[in-house]
């Protein structure tokens, strides 16, 4: 039997849920208004992937900050060491899935945000050399 989603936040214009969380993998669901920055530039020691369900997400990926905008059905996998940031694009809300493999503490970090508790997890500032290039990322504009 599949686990039930762990709803962390649900308001009129935003939502966040943990769908799967174990050491090997976490999958989270998010919904945010359009035109909103979600994260600034950072790197992980693990892979992070995004699948757009609705709306658009705008990414900056790699040492050069290559801009990529993906609509519904779009997918990007960002390998370990590749700098990235993203947000919702346009004026429409967006819904998407985020996959961390391995989890790297992301699910605990999300729970900590809700509880107002700082939780350390696998995230770091972009290194001085900018990290690895965007060519390492896997981008599928639409499935």
Model-assigned labels for residue ranges:
Residues 99-123:
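A hydrophobic/aromatic-rich effector-binding and dimerization subdomain
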């Amino acid at each position: 039997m599949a686990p039930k989603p762990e709803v962390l936040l649900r308001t009129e214009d935003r939502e966040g849920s943990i769908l799967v969380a174990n050491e090997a993998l976490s999958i989270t669901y998010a919904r945010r208004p359009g035109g909103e920055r979600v994260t600034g530039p950072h790197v992980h020691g693990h892979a992070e992937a995004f699948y757009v369900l609705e709306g658009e997400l705008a990414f900056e990926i790699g040492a050069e900050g290559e801009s990529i905008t993906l609509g519904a059905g779009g997918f990007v996998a960002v390998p370990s060491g590749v700098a990235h940031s993203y947000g919702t694009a346009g004026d429409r809300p967006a819904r998407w899935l985020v996959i961390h493999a391995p989890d790297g503490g992301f699910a605990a970090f999300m729970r900590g945000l809700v509880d107002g508790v700082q939780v350390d997890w696998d995230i770091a500032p972009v290194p001085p050399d900018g990290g690895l290039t965007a060519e390492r990322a896997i981008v599928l504009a639409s499935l």
